[in-house]
């Protein structure tokens, strides 16, 4: 398979008429959204009208809870933990994903990372054949995790993730360096180790180096195309191969545990 060639998404719908739901997890600034964007690009969906898209991408970041005045005051000082499971509106995430699986059009909140609040406008997402959902805790809640037919974990080293986060938060979110580093040490790193990293075991595919791993991403894209063509069943996706290592053996405890650790 050509490493960088774009491929057109097959016009066939999944066998059961429902979208193929893919969860993408990994630490902060690991490259989750870049991996999703690369998949969308390789499936030839970048320039497609939103009414006709067969692949859509959602971010867990859109579903941060509405903060109380006290929480918002802490957030503006960098003293609120946005990496904790309770920071997300998991009920709304679950409702949204279920509606997408039912072929419904949904409205996605738009979050303002500068003011730490939801904007008045929402993003309309139309039914699609493939739905990519990315987030640091995409696999944490079992009821959400069990909805994914494919689970990807973007595995990027801590130094790279920290440097990316510093640049992003300073350039895009108006933070200063001291605040970014304090928040990382106080909340981000401990939360990654406690809540995100343990969910890596649920991944069907682990992607070292994120979007730079062209081989792994091309394999994933081919796999998605096979599914859209009806070549593989949902059950067969559980044996899919890690980007560089051997296929995982899945144990009953993988799906029965309500918490990842």
UniProtKB/Swiss-Prot annotation:
Q: Which enzyme type, at the first EC level?
A: transferase
State the reactions this protein catalyses: uridine + ATP = UMP + ADP + H(+); cytidine + ATP = CMP + ADP + H(+)
In terms of InterPro entries, this protein maps to:
P-loop_NTPase (IPR027417), PRK/URK (IPR006083), Uridine_kinase-like (IPR000764)
Instruction: Give yes or no: UniProt keyword Oxidoreductase.
Output: no
**Is this entry keyworded Ligase?**
no
Q: Where does substrate bind?
A: 83, 111, 116, 165, 175, 183
Q: Where is the composition biased (Polar residues)?
A: 238-247
Disordered: region residues: 1-24, 238-261
UniProt-annotated binding residues for ATP: 26-34, 212
Which E.C. number(s) belong to this protein?
Answer: 2.7.1.48
Protein origin, superkingdom:
Eukaryota
Q: In which pathway does it act?
A: Pyrimidine metabolism; CTP biosynthesis via salvage pathway; CTP from cytidine: step 1/3; Pyrimidine metabolism; UMP biosynthesis via salvage pathway; UMP from uridine: step 1/1
Gene3D superfamilies cross-referenced by the UniProt entry: P-loop containing nucleotide triphosphate hydrolases
Q: List the disulfide bonds.
A: none
The UniProt function text for this chain reads: Phosphorylates uridine and cytidine to uridine monophosphate and cytidine monophosphate. Does not phosphorylate deoxyribonucleosides or purine ribonucleosides. Can use ATP or GTP as a phosphate donor.
Return the NCBIfam families for the record: PRK05480.1 (NF004018), udk (TIGR00235)
Per UniProt, subunit arrangement is: Homotetramer.
Protein name (record): Uridine-cytidine kinase 2
Annotated organism of origin: Xenopus tropicalis
The organism's lineage is: Eukaryota, Metazoa, Chordata, Craniata, Vertebrata
């Amino acid at each position: 398979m050509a490493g960088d060639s774009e491929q057109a998404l097959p016009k066939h719908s999944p066998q059961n008429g429902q979208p193929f739901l893919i969860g993408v997890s990994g630490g902060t600034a690991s490259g989750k959204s870049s991996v999703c964007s690369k998949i969308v690009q390789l499936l030839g969906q970048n320039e497609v009208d939103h009414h006709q898209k067969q692949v859509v991408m959602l971010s867990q970041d859109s579903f941060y809870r509405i903060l109380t005045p006290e929480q918002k005051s802490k957030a503006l000082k960098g003293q609120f933990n946005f990496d904790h499971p309770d920071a997300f509106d998991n009920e709304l995430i679950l409702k949204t994903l279920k509606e997408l699986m039912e072929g419904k059009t949904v409205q996605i909140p738009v979050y303002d990372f500068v003011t730490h609040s939801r904007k008045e406008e929402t993003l309309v997402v139309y039914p699609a054949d493939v739905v990519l959902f990315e987030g640091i805790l995409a696999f944490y809640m079992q009821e959400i995790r069990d909805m994914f037919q494919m689970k990807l974990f973007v595995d990027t080293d801590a130094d790279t993730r920290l440097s990316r986060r510093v640049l992003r938060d300073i350039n895009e979110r108006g933070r200063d360096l001291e605040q970014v580093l304090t928040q990382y040490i106080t909340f981000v790193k401990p939360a990654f180790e406690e809540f995100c990293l343990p969910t890596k075991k649920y991944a069907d595919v682990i992607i070292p180096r994120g979007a730079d791993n062209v081989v792994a991403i091309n394999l994933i894209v081919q796999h998605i195309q096979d599914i859209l063509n009806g070549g593989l069943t949902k059950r067969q996706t559980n044996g899919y191969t890690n980007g560089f290592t051997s296929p995982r053996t899945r144990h009953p405890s993988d799906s029965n545990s309500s918490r990842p650790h």
